[in-house]
Regions:
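Surface-exposed loop/turn elements that mediate protein-protein interactions on large endomembrane-trafficking
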Residues: 27-41, 69-96, 135-158, 182-205, ...
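Repeated scaffold domains used in trafficking and secretory/extracellular systems
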Residues: 42-53, 95-116, 160-172, 205-217, ...
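Positively charged n-region of N-terminal signal peptides that target proteins for export
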Residues: 1-4
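C-terminal motif of bacterial Sec signal peptides marking the signal peptidase cleavage site
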Residues: 12-15
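Residue position within the beta-strands of beta-propeller blades
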Residues: 58-61, 125-127, 177-179, 221-224, ...
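Bacterial lipoprotein signal-peptidase II cleavage site
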Residues: 17-26
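A generic tandem-repeat structural signature
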Residues: 113-189
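N-terminal export/targeting and maturation segments
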Residues: 31-69, 285-288
Length: 441
């Protein structure tokens, strides 16, 4: 599983100095030549960030053992069998002519890094930059093809890709959308067969706290916080008490700056809803119908009516000794997260339903670092079936270090399973095993 952080940046590196609306209020939309059709938005990247759900199952980049190339592969949502996307008879799946061929490794990196994103009947192929730092090697690209890999064509090629971007990608059947943030600059980019375009930009005198938080109808949902000044960091070597006081001062400063909810359409037209999100929000906002749900770290819960622009506070989640933290929205209005209990070294993992307040603690199925129990990890929602990491097999392997000397280390490969969402939420762990072509997804 790979959480890839990259964006097309030959266009982006100059963006940090681009003109953007001044002030801390809502930015004006950028002009566009022609309006895009009003098609419903949906998220195309999975919770794990490494693949996408579409016709036929879970699409992702597969790395054959000891091969210096990568292929497109699909996990069947019924059988759990992973297969190479190409179905041409006699194809060896190791040349550019293969419908599933993703790309070859380049000098400086033996690993082909990238993602596949399904947007209805289209498959997008996003190759990340070579290397661990900003790279000038022109091996990055964004392609689009039919869902079976045929009719593939390049949208953007070459350039420099910074490894800094949102892992969330969205589509409307005609274009892909993602965001980029660097210090005081934020932008939303639209990708389609006409290329790539910045449809919205925002700049601030402070760090820009803006993000895409979801979709509703034909619009992206944005959160943006007004400028505020954080206290300076404590001196190096400060006591735990001083750091705790600093953390509380940061929270107080942040709470004084409202967190706004806004909408952005496919052309970059920005609309502030007038709604204010919770001051200490957990930053994951599932949407169901016209309702957006929000949770504070304290457990307070809200429902926002996006059509009526109203908000109501719901019954709080059960009280816990620590704060609630949530990470993903894996299925419907369910979110996953954890809370730390004061005085404990570990944390408790859970699933929460922010619509009805349900609380679920799934039974652990694997051990982190071979000793810490962990619950199943969500990979993708395949309709009414969940693809999950349910185990971890540890093994020793060897590699060559930067000094040219071999060394051995312990790593793990995940074990995956499929389960009906209804069964998992009822407490079942009766998985259909996923059969992989290689070591891992």
């Amino acid at each position: 599983m790979k959480r890839l952080l990259c964006i097309l940046s030959a266009l982006l590196l100059c963006a940090c100095t681009a003109a953007a609306p001044a002030g801390s209020g809502a930015a004006e939309a950028l002009p566009t030549a022609q309006p895009a059709s009003a098609r419903e938005m949906h998220r195309v990247s999975s919770p794990s960030g490494g693949g996408s759900t579409g016709q036929g199952g879970y699409y992702h980049v597969y790395h054959p053992d000891d091969a210096e190339y990568a292929l497109a592969a699909v996990v069947d949502p019924v059988t759990g069998q992973e297969r190479i996307l190409c179905s041409r008879s006699g194809c060896a799946h190791n040349e550019e002519s293969c419908l599933a061929f993703f790309g070859r490794a380049t000098e400086g990196s033996p690993y082909v890094s990238g993602n596949l994103y399904v947007d209805r009947d289209k498959l997008y192929w996003l190759r990340s930059p070579t290397g661990n730092q900003i790279s000038n090697i022109n091996d990055a690209f964004l392609d689009v093809s039919d869902i079976d890999g045929s009719n593939r064509r390049r949208i953007v090629a070459g350039g420099v890709f910074p490894l800094i971007m949102s892992s969330g990608w969205y589509g409307n059947g005609e274009s892909l959308f993602s965001s980029y943030s660097c210090s005081s600059y934020f932008a939303v980019y639209r990708f389609n067969e006409n290329g790539v375009k910045a449809i919205y930009e925002r700049q601030s005198t402070q760090q820009v706290l803006t993000d895409i938080i979801g979709v509703w109808q034909d619009k992206l949902l944005l959160s943006w916080r007004e400028d505020y000044v954080s206290p300076d960091d404590p001196p190096e070597g400060s006591s735990e008490e001083l750091w705790s006081a600093w953390d509380e001062a940061c929270r107080t400063a942040m709470k004084q700056a409202p967190l706004h909810l806004a909408m952005l359409d496919a052309d970059g037209n920005f609309t502030d809803t007038g709604l204010i999100l919770p001051a200490e929000t957990c930053e994951v906002y599932p949407v169901q119908g016209d309702s957006l749900y929000a949770l504070e770290h304290s457990g307070r819960r809200w429902r926002y009516d996006l059509a009526a622009s109203t908000v109501e506070e719901l019954e709080s989640m059960p009280a816990v000794e620590g704060d609630y933290w949530i990470y993903d929205e894996p299925y419907g209005t369910w979110v996953t997260g954890s809370y730390f209990t004061p005085g404990q070294d570990d944390y408790t993992e859970y699933w929460l339903n922010l619509a009805d307040g349900s609380y679920l603690e799934p039974q652990p199925t694997w051990l982190k670092a071979e000793c810490v129990p962990r619950i199943p990890y969500m990979i993708a929602d395949l309709g009414d079936t969940l693809l999950m990491a349910v185990g971890c097999q540890y093994y020793d392997t060897s590699t060559t270090g930067q000094d040219g000397q071999p060394y051995t280390f312990t790593t793990c490969r995940f074990i995956y399973g499929l389960i009906p969402a209804e069964d998992f939420l009822a407490g079942s762990q009766n998985w259909t095993p996923v059969t992989l072509l290689g070591n891992d997804l």
